[in-house]
């Protein structure tokens, strides 16, 4: 009832329909509208129509369908392409175990490259056959054939090593011993000038640990980097610790040794001494000069007694 109402309401919606008055018999009606895209008429459809006609005449007709719903959809869709029957047989052969790409006439990238570009790119190497065959075998959707079985054996761990393309292979790495450089070989020695050493020593005498601000100022003044100034102070502190440690070791060694007695002056031997004559007093020398006088005898006046003269 509802369908009849819609049909009676707007007849212009179905311009090509054949309307019957009695009942709801929709069998003789045909709701096929004219093509709405006339621009697509420029495509070549003659080959597809001819291939369809050939396939219709060659194959047995399918089940009958009411004419009201148009022709049924055919399953042999491959007949619409150029060379429909040959392409269908080729695809069927490829699904049965062969390569569909080879059956349909596709060539490998190497053959296509060599055929279409013989002189434009002579320096490009052609792809290896194993790579091309491996890529084409992935298109095979049917049961595995001999080629697929061989490829599976190559992929298996127990089989041979897989053949990869040239661009997929990793470059061989050289021995690390010839390339690795140790930190000792990369070291370089900074030679400081006399002026730089003098200024650094002054700063070290003032403060053994330089501040960040003073380090920046000193580096800008002396034309050095902050890292060089920092390393110089580190080395200078290490040198000072080494000198102090050496001095402490020397002091410990001196304390461990026993103290030696001071050297005594040499004493003269008794036999080696000589008698030195004592000097004579003036009185003794005068008494000795007068003849007949008794030495050591003085007169009452304390003088020398005159000797008696004999006549």
Curated annotation (Swiss-Prot):
SMART domains the UniProt entry points to: HOX
Name used for this protein in its record: Homeobox protein CDX-2
Regions recorded as binding DNA: 185-244
Matches recorded under CDD domains: homeodomain
Species, as recorded: Mus musculus
Residues that bear Phosphoserine: 60, 281
Main location as per UniProt: nucleus
Function of the molecule: Transcription factor which regulates the transcription of multiple genes expressed in the intestinal epithelium. Binds to the promoter of the intestinal sucrase-isomaltase SI and activates SI transcription. Binds to the DNA sequence 5'-ATAAAAACTTAT-3' in the promoter region of VDR and activates VDR transcription. Binds to and activates transcription of LPH. Activates transcription of CLDN2 and intestinal mucin MUC2. Binds to the 5'-AATTTTTTACAACACCT-3' DNA sequence in the promoter region of CA1 and activates CA1 transcription.
GO term, biological process aspect, one: anterior/posterior pattern specification
GO-annotated cellular components: condensed nuclear chromosome; nucleoplasm; nucleus; protein-containing complex; transcription repressor complex
Cross-referenced Gene3D superfamilies: Homeodomain-like
Positions of the UniProt region annotated as Disordered: 111-151, 239-311
Stretches for region Interaction with DNA: 185-215
Subunit details: Can bind DNA as a monomer or homodimer.
Recorded superkingdom: Eukaryota
């Amino acid at each position: 009832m509802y369908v009849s109402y819609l049909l009676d309401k707007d007849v212009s919606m179905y311009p090509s329909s054949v309307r019957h008055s009695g009942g709801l018999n929709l069998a003789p009606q045909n709701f096929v509208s004219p093509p709405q895209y006339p621009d697509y008429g420029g495509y070549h459809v003659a080959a597809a129509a001819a291939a369809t006609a050939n396939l219709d005449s060659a194959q047995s007709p399918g089940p009958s369908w009411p004419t009201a719903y148009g022709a049924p959809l055919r399953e042999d869709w491959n007949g619409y392409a150029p060379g429909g029957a040959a392409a269908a047989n080729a695809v069927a052969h490829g699904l049965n175990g062969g390569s569909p790409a080879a059956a349909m006439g596709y060539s490998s990238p190497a053959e296509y490259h060599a055929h279409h570009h013989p002189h434009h790119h002579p320096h490009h190497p052609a792809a290896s056959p194993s790579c091309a065959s491996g890529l084409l075998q992935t298109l095979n959707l049917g049961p595995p054939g001999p080629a697929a079985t061989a490829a599976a054996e190559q992929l298996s761990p127990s089989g041979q090593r897989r053949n990869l393309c040239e661009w997929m292979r990793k470059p061989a790495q050289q021995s690390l011993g010839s390339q690795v450089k140790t930190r000792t070989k990369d070291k370089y020695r900074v030679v400081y000038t006399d002026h730089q050493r003098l200024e650094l020593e002054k700063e070290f005498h003032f403060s053994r640990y330089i501040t960040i601000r003073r380090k920046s100022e000193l580096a800008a003044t002396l034309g050095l980097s902050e890292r060089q100034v920092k390393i110089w102070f580190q080395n200078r502190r290490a040198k000072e610790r080494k000198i102090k440690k050496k001095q402490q070791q020397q002091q410990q060694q001196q304390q461990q040794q026993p103290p030696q007695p001071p050297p005594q002056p040499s004493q003269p031997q008794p036999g080696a001494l000589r008698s030195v004559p004592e000097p004579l007093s003036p009185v003794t020398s005068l008494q000795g000069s007068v003849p007949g006088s008794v030495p050591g005898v003085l007169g009452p006046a304390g003088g020398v007694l005159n000797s008696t003269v004999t006549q």
